[in-house]
């Protein structure tokens, strides 16, 4: 457009039109500060084609008294129609750019200077930045359109000018003298490449300083994936299996790579930081972080894989936000393909999310591309985040680990263990989770709704509620090499080829998942809502006098301070009364006043919701509650008998709640808890016998409330064992037993007013049955029917009668005896 007088006239008109809106400023704008030789021709190099950048450059050159880029210039006999060129060619309308080849102007300049020893040309690299630096910009809207490393199309450039044009900055850099490069006598082609390389490095370094580092690997990595040997083999297999041309199979692999890969952009990270800072302080009362210093210590020199628990969709953003705010590199986050929605998906991808399908089954090409993508992230040292639970917990409990991502990680480490991998568990605790009401609907049988862009606007409906604080605790790291040394001592000497899949992989991956889950539970952040829910849900009427509730909460705090669950577990500040006031301010408890004081209770709307928050910390109280349960039906019990019964039930509690202690550590922990219960007056010790308080005493009420914490879990155990025994040997399959357990639990919840949907959660029964099989209490015959060991009867009656009331045991046995009637009536 600037190569003729007419073009320059049109260009001048466009520049004046542009400056009706744009305002620009420059750094190093004079020939003195640039150290220019005004007797030598000056050229300007812009990194990529942009008419608006050229107009801004021309305006600033005129203002600073520098030679204009749109005017002709001569280098010896060479006449150039304009004094500028672009280092890379023009992108198409889709933003695609071919960076091969050299600018023709640069080719001619090098030739002219080489052929005429007295000539020189000064090339000034010029960078134009639209808007403030991302680090100083506070407007999330402007950050979305701020300069980034991604190649952009014309439409986005237009929006950038309109939104950010009032704060445009031009950076003139020190000139490159072509004469100095030519004097190296490297030949024409190498001199041109040398000049290009100097300018590319310069532009990159300057851009890094201004807008932040290029943390995206997408543009190069995706193309590299299809050339990896394992992916090449998968492409060939796909072409043969589906009878496709090799090019089509390769194109499919490339599409998979683009579907999967994240596209980290510093400006989007800053955008999310600004938006989330508002979010955490507007909807929540901020974030409380514990133990992050250990991550800051191990991050250098390690491949860090963050494995948080999964409670809410905002978990995806929370950890990245915290790490960025604390000077750590935000991770690449595994997200379900269901979140790859219009607008939101692109924003998440540029914030570091990579997307994965729910199942890889039947698609070996996709599997190969995904595995290679993760392997590349690991070997290049990019931090990664994924959720071992798979989906969000709807009950507040830790879900059984899904081991797929762990298996991919383990196999990748066996392929290349040069960079040590460390798993960092991250416990995320909410005083009120955004999706709480949705979870309750799903537990009650409502179908899971597909995610939608419109779900974002539901957040604004929550602004009227108070959501309390968010707690983030970093747990004890798990070094993968050390874990493998314990599980498979000879793993380093084995032949670890790219396709290596050892026989011990599945079992070791399962144990790794269980270890991660235990470490997550060890890092639990106990908050006021958890403790109030625990106390009120243990009462028969979901209500307590305020003074009584205060005593219960003070007791729980005292017990937890005396016997901490783990060094990474955290407790709330304040006493029981402070906890009550905090929960009241969130409108999670109702109250009624009378002449004797205030009664706090859970109304129908909040009663079920509060089971979610109780379940967050159920594992913390499992062992003391179990010990307390033995004294509901027995006034005294020896230490030996207590230990015997706890050891009998512990494997099942540990499997469901991911309790941290190994069986050989159990006796020591039992003694610690018994000592704490004695100190708090809930038990009395007489030599080797423990005695409960008088049934009419306040201490007995407190002991009973503590015991009821674990009652529903023990009831489920008793239901399953009663159904098995009443059905007889080899009469039920595991699936049939699950269905019967769910039906019985639903009936009992009505008969006994157990308003907790997870009481009849099928997955809990399924896992209990699996644990019985693992413990050798159950076995399956050739028809898949369940047989049981004699000790099942001991577990069902000998132990159950010690921890469950006679009324409950009778009710469960009656329902079990009449299960056929129940099945028949349920189908009418």
From Swiss-Prot:
* Signal peptide from the UniProt entry: none
Major localization listed first in the record, in broad terms: membrane
Q: How does it sit in the membrane?
A: Peripheral membrane protein
The UniProt catalytic activity note for this protein reads: sn-glycerol 3-phosphate + an acyl-CoA = a 1-acyl-sn-glycero-3-phosphate + CoA
Q: Which domain of life is it from?
A: Bacteria
Q: Which UniProt keywords apply?
A: Acyltransferase, Cell inner membrane, Cell membrane, Lipid biosynthesis, Lipid metabolism, Membrane, Phospholipid biosynthesis, Phospholipid metabolism, Transferase
Q: Where in the cell is it found?
A: Cell inner membrane
Drop me one GO molecular function for this one.
glycerol-3-phosphate O-acyltransferase activity
Q: HXXXXD motif: where is this motif?
A: 309-314
Might you give the EC number(s) for this enzyme? 2.3.1.15
Any one GO biological process: CDP-diacylglycerol biosynthetic process
Q: What class of enzyme is it?
A: transferase
What pathway is this protein a component of? Phospholipid metabolism; CDP-diacylglycerol biosynthesis; CDP-diacylglycerol from sn-glycerol 3-phosphate: step 1/3
Q: What is recorded about the domains?
A: The HXXXXD motif is essential for acyltransferase activity and may constitute the binding site for the phosphate moiety of the glycerol-3-phosphate.
Q: Which family does it belong to?
A: Belongs to the GPAT/DAPAT family.
This protein is called Glycerol-3-phosphate acyltransferase
Q: Which organism is it from?
A: Pseudomonas putida (strain GB-1)
- Lineage of producing organism: Bacteria, Pseudomonadati, Pseudomonadota, Gammaproteobacteria, Pseudomonadales
């Amino acid at each position: 457009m600037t190569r003729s007088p007419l073009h320059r006239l049109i260009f001048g008109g466009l520049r004046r039109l542009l400056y009706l809106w744009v305002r620009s400023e420059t750094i190093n704008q004079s020939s003195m500060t640039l150290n220019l030789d005004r007797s030598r021709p000056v050229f300007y190099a812009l990194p990529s084609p942009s008419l608006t950048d050229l107009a801004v450059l021309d305006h600033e050159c005129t203002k600073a008294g520098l030679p204009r880029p749109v005017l002709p210039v001569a280098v010896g006999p060479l006449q150039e129609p304009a004094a500028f060129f672009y280092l890379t060619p023009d992108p198409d309308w889709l933003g695609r750019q071919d960076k091969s080849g050299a600018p023709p102007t640069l080719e001619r300049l090098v030739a002219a200077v080489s052929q005429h020893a007295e000539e020189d040309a000064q090339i000034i690299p010029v960078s134009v930045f639209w808007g403030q630096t991302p680090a100083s910009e506070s407007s999330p809207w402007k950050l979305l359109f701020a300069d980034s490393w991604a190649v952009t199309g014309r439409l986005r450039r237009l929006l950038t000018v309109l939104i950010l044009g009032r704060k445009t900055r031009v950076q003139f850099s020190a000139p490159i003298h072509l004469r100095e490069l030519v004097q190296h006598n490297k030949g024409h082609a190498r001199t041109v490449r040398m000049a290009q390389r100097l300018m590319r490095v310069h532009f990159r370094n300057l851009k890094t300083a201004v807008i932040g580092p290029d943390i995206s690997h997408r543009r190069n990595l995706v193309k590299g994936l299809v050339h990896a040997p394992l992916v090449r083999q998968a492409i060939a297999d796909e072409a043969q299996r589906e009878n496709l041309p090799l090019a089509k199979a390769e194109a499919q692999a490339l599409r998979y790579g683009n579907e999967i890969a994240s596209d980290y952009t510093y400006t989007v990270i800053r955008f999310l930081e600004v938006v989330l800072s508002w979010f955490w302080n507007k909807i929540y009362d901020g974030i409380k972080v514990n133990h992050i210093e250990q991550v800051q210590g191990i991050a250098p020199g390690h491949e860090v894989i963050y494995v948080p628990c999964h409670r809410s969709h905002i978990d995806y953003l929370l950890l990245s936000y915290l790490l960025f705010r604390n000077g750590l590199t935000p991770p690449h986050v595994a997200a379900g393909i269901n979140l790859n929605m219009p607008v939101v998906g692109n924003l998440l991808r540029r914030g570091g999310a990579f997307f994965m399908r729910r199942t890889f089954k039947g698609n070996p090409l996709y599997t190969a591309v995904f595995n290679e993508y993760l392997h590349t992230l690991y070997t290049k040292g990019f931090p990664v985040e994924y959720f071992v639970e798979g989906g969000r917990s709807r009950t507040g409990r830790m879900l059984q680990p899904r081991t797929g991502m762990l298996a991919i990680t383990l196999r990748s480490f066996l392929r290349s263990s040069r960079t040590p991998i460390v798993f960092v568990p991250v416990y995320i605790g909410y005083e009120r989770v955004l999706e709480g009401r949705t979870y309750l609907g799903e537990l009650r049988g409502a179908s899971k709704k597909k995610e939608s862009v419109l779900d974002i606007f539901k957040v604004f409906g929550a602004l009227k509620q108070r959501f309390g604080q968010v707690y983030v605790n970093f747990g004890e790291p798990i070094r993968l090499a050390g874990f493998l040394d314990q599980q498979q001592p000879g793993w380093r000497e084995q032949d670890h080829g790219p396709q290596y899949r050892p026989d011990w992989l599945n079992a070791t991956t399962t144990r790794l998942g269980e270890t991660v889950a235990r470490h997550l539970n060890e890092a639990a952040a106990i908050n006021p809502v958890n403790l109030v829910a625990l106390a009120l849900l243990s009462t028969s009427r979901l209500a307590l006098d305020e003074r009584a509730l205060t005593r219960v909460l003070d007791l729980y705090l005292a017990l937890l301070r005396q016997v901490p669950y783990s060094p990474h577990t955290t407790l709330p500040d304040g006493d029981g009364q402070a906890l009550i006031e905090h929960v009241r301010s969130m409108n999670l408890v109702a109250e009624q006043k009378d002449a004797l004081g205030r009664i706090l209770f859970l109304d129908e709307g909040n009663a079920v919701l509060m089971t979610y928050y109780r379940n967050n910390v159920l594992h913390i109280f499992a062992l003391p509650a179990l010990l307390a349960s033995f004294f509901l039906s027995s006034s005294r019990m020896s230490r030996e008998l207590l230990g015997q019964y706890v050891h009998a039930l512990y494997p099942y509690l540990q499997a469901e709640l991911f309790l941290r202690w190994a069986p050989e550590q159990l006796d020591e922990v039992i003694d610690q808890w018994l000592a704490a219960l004695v100190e708090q007056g809930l038990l009395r010790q007489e030599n080797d016998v423990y005695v409960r308080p008088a049934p009419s005493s306040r201490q007995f009420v407190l002991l009973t409330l503590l015991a009821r914490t674990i009652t529903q879990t023990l009831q489920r155990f008793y239901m399953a064992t009663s159904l098995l025994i009443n059905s007889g040997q080899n009469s039920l399959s595991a699936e049939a037993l699950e269905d019967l357990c769910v039906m019985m639990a639903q009936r009992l919840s009505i008969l006994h007013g157990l308003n907790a949907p997870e009481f009849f959660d099928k997955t809990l029964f399924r896992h209990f049955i699996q644990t019985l099989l693992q413990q050798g209490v159950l076995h399956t015959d050739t028809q898949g029917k369940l047989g049981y060991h004699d000790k099942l009867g001991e577990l069902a009656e000998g132990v159950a009668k010690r921890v469950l009331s006679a009324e409950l045991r009778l009710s469960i046995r009656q329902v079990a005896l009449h299960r056929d009637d129940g099945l028949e009536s349920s189908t009418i």
